């Protein structure tokens, strides 16, 4: 397993940086009324990791028991469109932009189906199901309009978590219906702390000059930094670590 997957935080308490954002997510979990959410920020900053940790905090460890399904949709000319769904009993993750110009069709069908389906686990901590929409800023205007209508109609039993690099291409009616959560690129010191944590867990010594170089060249992309660390693993005894 790659380091980036092996050491990805699974709980809010394990998140390594942006403590103010972690506190905000913990407050959301404690709240009885969770709004639609829009996570935005540069690639590799940790948006998906925070969404995954939030889902576990909302629903428990069952949110990490995932399955992958391939769904087939027919466009107006009866051509098949295949889209992969990642789901647990409590949430579904989709990337509608995989459907290209037919993303509106995917949004309408999947969200309507999920919204009209009862929570599988009757003892679930939350009565609503959650849909995570990746690359929300790549959705067409038609798909975003369909999404807006869905947000209004099915708020009672469904919440949306949108993930995007930027909010600039997301229509105002969607932004106004979401709590905006910015996940900024971490500082080099934050990235270095993550790298030291991985190195310690893997029992090898990571010189400060190497971790500094990796962090600087990663330009705030933690995923990239960890991948580079694995490639450049320094074969020095763990006894150097305190």
Named regions from a protein language model:
Residues 188-196, 215:
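An amphipathic alpha-helix signature
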Residues 165:
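Conserved H-loop
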Residues 18, 220-221:
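Short loop-to-helix capping motifs
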Residues 239-242:
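Conserved small/polar residues in nucleotide/adenosyl-binding loops
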């Amino acid at each position: 397993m790659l380091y980036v997957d092996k050491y990805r935080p699974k709980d809010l308490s394990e998140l390594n940086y942006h403590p103010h954002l972690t506190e905000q997510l913990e407050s959301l979990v404690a709240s009885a009324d969770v709004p639609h959410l829009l996570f935005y920020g540069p690639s590799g900053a940790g948006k998906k990791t925070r969404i995954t940790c939030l889902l576990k905090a909302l629903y428990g460890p069952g949110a990490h028991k995932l399955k992958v399904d391939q769904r087939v949709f027919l466009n107006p000319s009866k051509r098949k469109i295949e889209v992969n769904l990642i789901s647990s009993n409590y949430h579904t993750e989709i990337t509608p932009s995989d459907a290209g110009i037919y993303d509106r069709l995917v949004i309408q069908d999947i969200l309507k189906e999920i919204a009209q389906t009862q929570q599988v686990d009757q003892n679930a901590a939350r009565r609503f199901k959650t849909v995570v929409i990746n690359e929300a800023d790549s959705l067409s205007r038609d798909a975003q309009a369909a999404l807006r209508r869905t947000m209004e109609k099915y708020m009672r039993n469904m919440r949306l978590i949108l993930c995007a690099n930027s909010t600039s291409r997301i229509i105002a009616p969607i932004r106004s219906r979401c709590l905006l959560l910015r996940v900024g690129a971490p500082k080099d010191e934050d990235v270095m702390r993550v790298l030291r944590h991985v190195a310690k867990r893997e029992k090898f010594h990571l010189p400060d000059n190497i971790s500094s170089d990796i962090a600087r060249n990663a330009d705030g992309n933690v995923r990239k930094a960890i991948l580079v660390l694995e490639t450049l693993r320094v074969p020095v005894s763990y006894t150097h670590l305190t």
